[in-house]
């Protein structure tokens, strides 16, 4: 049973990496299409910065040698995902173009899924022994 449980979490971790890379690409592409008017520059910069920080903290978690560092970086990745969601929602309010709002809405939905997955992953890592030894696989390069 433990092997299948571990396998499920390895699959979820791989899913998380795939989703993070895709949504970061979507955020960067979207940011390039936003206007640089009142406050727009700051919103774009912060949106991209926090989106990329999610991946950065996941990489740091995977490189952690101590369970405390692993947990801290996973938690920080989740907080950065929540912060990115804030910037995306702010951009949605500031943007008047329907097509941009549609794209933002899609990305916001993706971030809700990522925040949920990170929350489940954090809960999993806090309840299982030796989790750091099994979940330091990093992103898959294809």
Predicted segments with their positions:
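Short, C-terminally biased terminal segments at protein or domain edges
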Residues: 1-56, 64-142
């Amino acid at each position: 049973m433990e092997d299948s449980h571990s396998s499920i979490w390895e699959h979820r971790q791989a899913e998380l990496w795939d989703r993070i890379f895709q949504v970061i690409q979507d955020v960067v592409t979207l940011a390039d299409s936003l206007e640089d008017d009142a406050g727009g520059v700051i919103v774009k910069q912060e949106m991209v910065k926090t989106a990329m920080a999610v991946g950065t903290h996941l990489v740091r978690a995977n490189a952690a040698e101590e369970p405390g560092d692993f947990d801290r970086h996973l938690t920080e990745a989740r907080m950065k995902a929540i912060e990115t969601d804030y910037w995306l929602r702010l951009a949605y309010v500031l943007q008047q173009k329907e097509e941009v709002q549609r794209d933002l809405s899609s990305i916001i939905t993706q971030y809700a899924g990522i925040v949920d997955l990170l929350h489940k992953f954090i809960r999993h890592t806090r309840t299982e022994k030796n989790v750091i030894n099994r979940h330091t696989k990093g992103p898959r390069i294809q």
